[in-house]
Amino acid sequence: MCGIVGYTGTQNAAPILLEGLKKLEYRGYDSAGIAVVQDNHISVSKVTGRIAGLAEKTDDGKLLPGMTGIGHTRWATHGAPTEPNAHPHTSNNGRFAVVHNGIIENHMDLREELTRKGYHFESETDTEVVVHLIEMYYKGNLKQAVMRTSARLRGSYALGIICADEPEKIFAVRESSPLILGLGIGENYFASDVTALVAYTRNAIYLENGEFAEITPDCVTIFDCTGHTVQKRISRVTWDIQAAEKGGYDHFMLKEIMEQPRAVKATMAPRMKGCDISLDDLDIDLSGIRNILITACGSAYYAGCAAKYAIEKLCKLPVQTELASELRYSDPLIDNQTLLIVLSQSGETADTIAAMRECQRRGAKTLAIVNVVGSTIAKIADWCLYTWAGPEIAVATTKGYTTQLTVLYLFALYAAKKLETVEDSTWRKLLSALKALPKQIQQALDMNPGMVHLAKKYHSACSMFFIGRNTDYAVALEGALKMKEISYIHAESYAAGELKHGTIALICEGQPVIALCCNEAITEKTMSNIVEVKARGAEVLAVAFRDNAKIVSLADDMLYIPKIHPLFSAAVEIIPLQLLAYHVARENGCDIDKPKNLAKSVTVE
């Protein structure tokens, strides 16, 4: 959601803060601001809209001199996207400034208390209570004020705090919202995401819940909630900063679509040992598992839906999928014979973390599949498998989805061999089919030039329907999400067999229907649905294998993918749908990498 950065050192802080905020744009935001300490005074600049406007307002930071500062990109939760609601927020006496990512759940009670005590509020946000509490508790010791303030807060928060009276010092506080410290020489940093730090340092410390840090140019000291110092391991950030640049592509999304063969290979190759699969240090006693539950949000959830069929078929275990935002409030039948598989690109998705903790409380064993090393989900899981996708900057996930599928497919084969639920000869054929995945994804990507023509045909549609059965339906879910989130065209997915149970009433002349027809065992059933919608005037764009002549005779337009084993088809089927969504959005002039109202990492509920 929001992004925060901080710097203290020997350079002017504002340009560094602006650059860090630019690296956090992909998280989604509607306003931005920075605050800098100079000559025992705090200067603040805020704008609604893009960071480019903030850079222009401050002359790229030159109008805000000072070597200690904090910055923020806001995604509105409490209060409209206005300058008064933008961060940083300052105290009534102007001596303190705060940036915040998260939600203060008890802000209404705190606001009433502070108002009674004479504090004046300039904004509608939950964050402003924090800076007034700090002012109230400050008696010449910022550390003590921060501790007393944190003890009053309920909710999730990552805070950055500066004080005009202690101008070379920043306090950073974490509670259920990611916060990373960057270590330099004569300068130090913090940010809500490592992407804001790698241009300046590769040495990072990941704060845990309940910890806070005192940051000066020469020293970083970390404390627990009682104020005792904590020794932390320094992590080395290994990925190349060039991976977070566009590299000649017009958009990060297109770059990341094109990176999928490499990302899938990077995720797969270290885990394939000849004719065997080795899943890092995974040591689950699968013989004691009676059911598997997959939980996630958004595209990660749809990856779980697609992989469910492979895991269930190969492992002969019942597999359920449940949205994390629903699972956390349900009463699931979970015990110590349940394996919970948790998917999250960022490893910081708030609903997923909450659902995971609830299932752990009930005894479930937990396996995390995440992309960000050292993230919260990775740390609290019993086991973790990383998707080596590299940084994903575009808000709409692409390589994150396909690498999650890859790990799930690897797990399905690994578990099937351990459980002896698949014959050896069949297992070897499946392994060979999985090894071909990067090549087949590349072949699907080769259709990119032809997408422009289809985008010109379909970009003016008011709505689109995506249909399929079984795995094809799971892919339809993700395809519809891609279309709606970046092109702003209403797109819905339906199990093809459900069309006649209501949805077919919406089919009219010229209505685009994207039909997924890659599961040959049930293709004829989907063909009957194509005939039904065609009879009512729909324009059908079908995704199928090239040798499927029957589909060609029915569809108005075709998207071909290479032949692939049906258990693994989702990772290839999704490629043309990603490309179609990208080119439709481009035709419509949409902000492809940063769609309106969306955030890359949803760290609040």
Say what each PLM segment does:
Residues S156-E187, L454, H459-E485, E520-I522, ...:
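Acidic/histidine-rich
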Residues S287-K429, A433-A436, L516-L559, L580, ...:
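Glycine-rich phosphate-binding loops that contact phosphosugars or nucleotide phosphates
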Residues M1-K246, D250-H251, R262-R290, Y302, ...:
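Conserved short alpha-helical segments that host acidic/polar catalytic motifs at enzyme active sites
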